[in-house]
């Protein structure tokens, strides 16, 4: 019975090995529907699928048909986060190498599919707490793991089993606890010369800055988890600013022991750079960290 259920699930997935597509990363993001692209293809499909009774021109019966559409730009799109130029800057020279890429937080797997076709010789790993049935795709080089990033035991087992990665992309919780927990848990798994990417931190930072400003202007205390933003923290790492150690003494945030002095020592000793990048999209934000 279980084998029959699994067979039914996998038979409905889009087989990435059976699709021949362009190798341009932004086009792949648009085609598969990742919001990392300049245009958000998933939102177009979702929008017109809801309206298809009144829209005879939208002839795509399912997402596989949508992925295989011709004339990619002949549709109405919402603007995406425009991450492709940033990724291309760092990934272009290694796109044809055999590497290991891990994305943390994959939802239906549209970014995984894009990276699978872009890095056409590489192993692509994905982690998410959603059941594997929610993943739209399959491929011989694609590996998916149903893991909650806050489950320390499962994360330890995963990193022990799968060793180092050349690229790690955090696209999961987008808040302080999630971002810092992932950084601590996965930085050691980043290989020498590898890239650790943190996406979509800007909204959390702006929200926090406004809240701190409001309390200060009204002579009140800000009692959040910490008094720094994600952008501030990783800028301090890049500047090798040892004042970052003082952040560990802040309470109650660091009572959870997310960060430790020994971990920061490790980062300072192995970090080549940590740089933020933004596009003109209001929430587009990315930190690119390179390990020596």
Enumerate the language-model features and the residues they cover:
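A short alpha-helical cap/connector motif
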Residues: 1-169, 173-198, 202-292
């Amino acid at each position: 019975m279980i084998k029959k259920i699994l067979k039914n699930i996998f038979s409905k997935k889009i087989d990435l090995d059976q699709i021949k597509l362009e190798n341009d990363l932004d086009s792949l993001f648009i085609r598969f529907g990742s919001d990392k692209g300049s245009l958000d293809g998933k939102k177009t499909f979702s929008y017109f699928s809801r309206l298809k009774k009144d829209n005879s021109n939208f002839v795509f019966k399912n997402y596989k048909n949508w992925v295989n559409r011709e004339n990619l730009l002949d549709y109405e799109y919402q603007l995406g986060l425009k991450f492709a130029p940033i990724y291309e800057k760092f990934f272009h020279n290694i796109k044809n190498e055999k590497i290991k890429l891990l994305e943390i937080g994959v939802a239906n797997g549209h970014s995984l599919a894009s990276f699978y076709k872009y890095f056409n010789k590489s192993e692509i790993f994905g982690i998410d707490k959603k059941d594997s049935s929610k993943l739209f795709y399959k491929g011989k080089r694609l590996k998916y793991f149903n893991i909650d990033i806050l489950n320390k035991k499962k994360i330890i087992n995963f990193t022990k089993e799968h060793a180092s990665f050349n690229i790690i992309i955090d696209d999961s919780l987008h808040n302080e606890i999630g971002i810092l927990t992932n950084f601590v848990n996965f930085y050691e798994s980043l290989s020498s010369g590898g890239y650790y990417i943190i996406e979509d931190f800007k909204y959390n930072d702006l929200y926090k800055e406004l809240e701190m400003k409001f309390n200060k202007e009204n002579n009140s205390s800000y009692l959040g988890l910490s008094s720094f933003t994600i952008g501030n923290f990783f800028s301090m790492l890049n500047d090798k600013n040892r004042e970052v150690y003082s952040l560990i003494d802040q309470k109650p945030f660091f009572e959870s022991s997310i960060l430790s002095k020994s971990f920061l020592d490790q980062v300072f000793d192995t970090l080549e750079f940590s740089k933020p990048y933004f596009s003109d999209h209001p929430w587009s934000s990315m930190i690119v960290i390179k390990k020596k």
